[in-house]
Amino acid sequence: MSLLTEVETPIRSEWGCRCNDSSDPLVVAASIIGILHLILWILDRLFFKCIYRFFEHGLKRGPSTEGVPESMREEYRKEQQSAVDADDSHFVSIELE
Protein backbone atom coordinates (compact mmCIF):
# COMPACT_ATOMS: atom_id res chain seq x y z
CA MET A 1 0.00 0.00 0.00
CA SER A 2 1.46 3.39 -0.95
CA LEU A 3 1.97 6.24 1.46
CA LEU A 4 -0.57 8.42 -0.37
CA THR A 5 -3.42 6.06 0.40
CA GLU A 6 -2.51 6.07 4.09
CA VAL A 7 -3.11 9.83 4.41
CA GLU A 8 -6.56 10.81 5.57
CA THR A 9 -8.38 13.13 3.23
CA PRO A 10 -10.82 15.60 4.76
CA ILE A 11 -14.45 15.17 3.96
CA ARG A 12 -16.29 18.05 2.32
CA SER A 13 -17.98 19.20 5.54
CA GLU A 14 -14.57 19.87 7.14
CA TRP A 15 -13.37 22.20 4.38
CA GLY A 16 -15.24 25.22 5.74
CA CYS A 17 -13.64 28.11 7.51
CA ARG A 18 -12.74 27.17 11.05
CA CYS A 19 -12.16 30.71 12.28
CA ASN A 20 -15.78 31.66 12.86
CA ASP A 21 -14.82 33.35 16.11
CA SER A 22 -13.59 36.61 14.55
CA SER A 23 -13.89 38.44 17.86
CA ASP A 24 -10.56 36.96 18.93
CA PRO A 25 -8.19 39.93 19.47
CA LEU A 26 -5.37 38.16 17.65
CA VAL A 27 -7.53 37.65 14.56
CA VAL A 28 -8.65 41.30 14.64
CA ALA A 29 -5.07 42.55 15.03
CA ALA A 30 -3.85 40.31 12.20
CA SER A 31 -6.64 41.54 9.94
CA ILE A 32 -5.87 45.19 10.66
CA ILE A 33 -2.14 44.67 10.08
CA GLY A 34 -2.85 42.81 6.85
CA ILE A 35 -5.13 45.55 5.52
CA LEU A 36 -2.64 48.30 6.45
CA HIS A 37 0.18 46.36 4.81
CA LEU A 38 -1.85 45.99 1.62
CA ILE A 39 -2.73 49.71 1.55
CA LEU A 40 0.89 50.76 2.12
CA TRP A 41 2.14 48.36 -0.56
CA ILE A 42 -0.36 49.72 -3.10
CA LEU A 43 0.59 53.33 -2.29
CA ASP A 44 4.27 52.44 -2.56
CA ARG A 45 3.80 50.90 -6.00
CA LEU A 46 1.68 53.82 -7.22
CA PHE A 47 3.93 56.61 -5.97
CA PHE A 48 7.36 54.97 -5.69
CA LYS A 49 9.01 57.44 -8.07
CA CYS A 50 7.82 60.44 -6.06
CA ILE A 51 8.61 58.85 -2.71
CA TYR A 52 12.15 57.70 -3.50
CA ARG A 53 13.01 60.85 -5.47
CA PHE A 54 12.03 62.88 -2.40
CA PHE A 55 14.23 60.79 -0.10
CA GLU A 56 17.13 60.72 -2.57
CA HIS A 57 17.25 64.47 -3.11
CA GLY A 58 15.88 65.49 0.26
CA LEU A 59 18.62 63.70 2.18
CA LYS A 60 21.42 64.80 -0.18
CA ARG A 61 21.20 68.46 0.65
CA GLY A 62 24.57 70.00 1.23
CA PRO A 63 25.76 71.54 4.44
CA SER A 64 23.98 74.63 5.69
CA THR A 65 25.22 77.84 4.08
CA GLU A 66 23.65 80.11 6.64
CA GLY A 67 26.05 82.89 7.60
CA VAL A 68 28.54 81.99 4.84
CA PRO A 69 29.53 84.78 2.44
CA GLU A 70 28.28 84.49 -1.15
CA SER A 71 31.83 84.24 -2.54
CA MET A 72 32.53 81.16 -0.43
CA ARG A 73 29.19 79.63 -1.45
CA GLU A 74 30.07 80.10 -5.13
CA GLU A 75 33.52 78.57 -4.58
CA TYR A 76 31.96 75.56 -2.85
CA ARG A 77 29.46 75.10 -5.72
CA LYS A 78 32.32 75.18 -8.26
CA GLU A 79 34.28 72.58 -6.29
CA GLN A 80 31.25 70.30 -6.08
CA GLN A 81 30.53 70.69 -9.80
CA SER A 82 34.16 69.98 -10.74
CA ALA A 83 34.05 66.84 -8.59
CA VAL A 84 30.89 65.71 -10.40
CA ASP A 85 32.42 66.51 -13.80
CA ALA A 86 35.54 64.52 -12.92
CA ASP A 87 33.44 61.50 -11.95
CA ASP A 88 31.54 61.64 -15.25
CA SER A 89 34.73 60.97 -17.21
CA HIS A 90 35.32 57.54 -15.64
CA PHE A 91 33.67 54.93 -17.81
CA VAL A 92 34.37 51.23 -17.96
CA SER A 93 35.07 49.97 -21.45
CA ILE A 94 34.22 46.31 -21.99
CA GLU A 95 35.31 44.72 -25.24
CA LEU A 96 33.82 41.40 -26.28
CA GLU A 97 35.92 39.07 -28.39
Swiss-Prot record:
GO terms for molecular function: monoatomic ion channel activity; proton transmembrane transporter activity. Coiled coil: none annotated. The M2 protein from most influenza A strains is inhibited by amantadine and rimantadine, resulting in viral uncoating incapacity. Emergence of amantadine-resistant variants is usually rapid. The chain crosses the membrane at residues 23-43. One of its GO terms (cellular component) is membrane. It is a single-pass type III membrane protein. The record marks 37 as: Essential for channel activity, possibly by being protonated during channel activation, and by forming the channel gate and the selective filter. The modification Phosphoserine is found at residues 64, 82, 93. It is found in: Virion membrane; Host apical cell membrane. A lipid is attached at residue 50 (S-palmitoyl cysteine). InterPro entries: Flu_M2 (IPR002089). Pfam families: Flu_M2. The keyword DNA repair does not apply. The keyword Methyltransferase does not apply. Residues 60-88 are annotated as: Disordered. It comes from the Viruses. GO terms for biological process: protein complex oligomerization; symbiont genome entry into host cell via pore formation in plasma membrane; symbiont-mediated suppression of host autophagy. Glycans are attached at residue 20. Keywords: Disulfide bond, Glycoprotein, Host cell membrane, Host membrane, Host-virus interaction, Hydrogen ion transport, Inhibition of host autophagy by virus, Ion channel, Ion transport, Lipoprotein, Membrane, Palmitate, Phosphoprotein, Signal-anchor, Transmembrane, Transmembrane helix, Transport, Viral ion channel, Virion. The record marks 41 as: Seems to be involved in pH gating. When the channel is activated, one or more imidazole moieties of His-37 probably become bi-protonated. Forms a proton-selective ion channel that is necessary for the efficient release of the viral genome during virus entry. After attaching to the cell surface, the virion enters the cell by endocytosis. Acidification of the endosome triggers M2 ion channel activity. Homotetramer; composed of two disulfide-linked dimers held together by non-covalent interactions. May interact with matrix protein 1. Cytoplasmic tail plays an important role in virion assembly and morphogenesis. Belongs to the influenza viruses matrix protein M2 family. This is Matrix protein 2. The lineage of its organism: Viruses, Riboviria, Orthornavirae, Negarnaviricota, Polyploviricotina.
